[in-house]
Design a protein with these regions (language model features):
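Short connector loops at helix/strand junctions that flank enzyme active sites
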Residues: 54-58, 68-72, 100-106, 124-126, ...
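Extracellular/periplasm-exposed beta-strand and loop segments of Gram-negative cell-envelope proteins
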Residues: 38-54, 81-103, 135-179, 207-229
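Short glycine/proline- and aromatic-enriched beta-strand/turn motifs that initiate or cap beta-hairpins
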Residues: 20-60
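Extended, basic/helix-rich recognition subdomains
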Residues: 189-212
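Short loop/turn motifs that connect adjacent beta-strands in outer-membrane beta-barrel proteins
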Residues: 20-26, 69-70, 114-124, 140, ...
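Bacterial Sec-dependent N-terminal signal peptides
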Residues: 1-27, 228-237
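Residues on the lipid-exposed face of transmembrane beta-strands in outer-membrane beta-barrel proteins
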Residues: 30-34, 57-65, 77-79, 105-111, ...
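Hydrophobic, well-structured mid-protein blocks that either form specific transmembrane helices
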Residues: 97-139, 143
Length: 237
């Protein structure tokens, strides 16, 4: 009889532990990876002019809440480099490398497939969509241009090389610092209980025109990025 009581007690304990494990609602996560960005603008009227993708670094921390069933909402803070290369390959070719740094605040909604890591261990897949606000913290440019593109210049067409940091206090190009965008992506991960590991892909599309006065140019100019990350998460309660 004692063995029966002991078995029942152990059963209740196991159920209690399982219930406790399935009660997770919050998790914090950290991730880092590579961003590949380009300036999305119309250069069809400019002969042999291109904007090309350049890789950058991204890192983020955030929190996520399991709202109901498989649905979760998350937010965080993220650093992302949106770098790209401008090239003119005409007779007097020149180029500029743009290193653009942003701090952004993303908000996303995701849906877990296969397994819900808040309730069970195993492989999970999470498609997600969201929006973000970002602040343009700094821009560094490096490149060269031919002297003969300067008005009134007469000479041998030699090049000027430059390596500068943009002065946002003067903001001579009237760049917009507060920007908004949308993103969509997918994460694949594995839950070990409290700990999750994951890899993810996100496409980030800029809603905001990069200049303060869009009327000053008829061309659309936005920064778009593809981001690949690896991350870990820890469930709190």
């Amino acid at each position: 009889m004692r063995k029966v009581y002991l078995a029942i007690a152990l059963g209740f304990c196991c159920q209690g532990i399982q219930a406790q494990q399935s009660s997770y609602r919050w998790k914090v996560e950290a991730e880092a990876g590579v961003s590949c960005s380009v300036l999305d603008t119309d250069v069809s009227g400019l002969s042999e002019t291109y904007y090309k993708v350049r890789p950058g670094f991204t890192a983020a921390i955030g929190a996520e809440y399991n709202i109901v069933d498989q649905l979760a909402v998350g937010a965080g803070i993220r650093f992302v480099q949106r770098d790209y290369l401008y090239q003119n390959l005409g007779g007097d070719s020149w180029n500029t490398r743009y290193n653009n740094n942003f701090i952004s605040i993303p908000l996303h909604l995701g849906y877990y497939l296969l397994h819900n890591p808040y309730h069970e261990k195993g492989l999970w897949i999470k498609p997600q969509v969201g929006v973000y606000y970002e602040y343009f913290t700094s821009m560094h440019t490096k490149g060269m241009y031919p002297m003969n593109i300067m008005e009134g210049y007469k000479g041998d067409g030699s090049y000027i090389r430059y390596n500068t940091t943009y002065d946002f206090r003067k903001n001579e190009n009237h760049l917009r610092r507060s920007l908004f965008g949308g993103e969509a992506g997918i994460k694949v991960g594995y839950s070990l209980g409290r700990l999750d590991g994951s890899i993810g892909y996100n496409f980030q599309y800029g809603f905001s025109h990069i200049y303060q006065d869009k009327a000053s140019t008829s061309k659309t100019a936005r920064r778009n990025s593809s981001v690949i990350t690896a991350g870990i998460a820890y469930k709190l309660f």
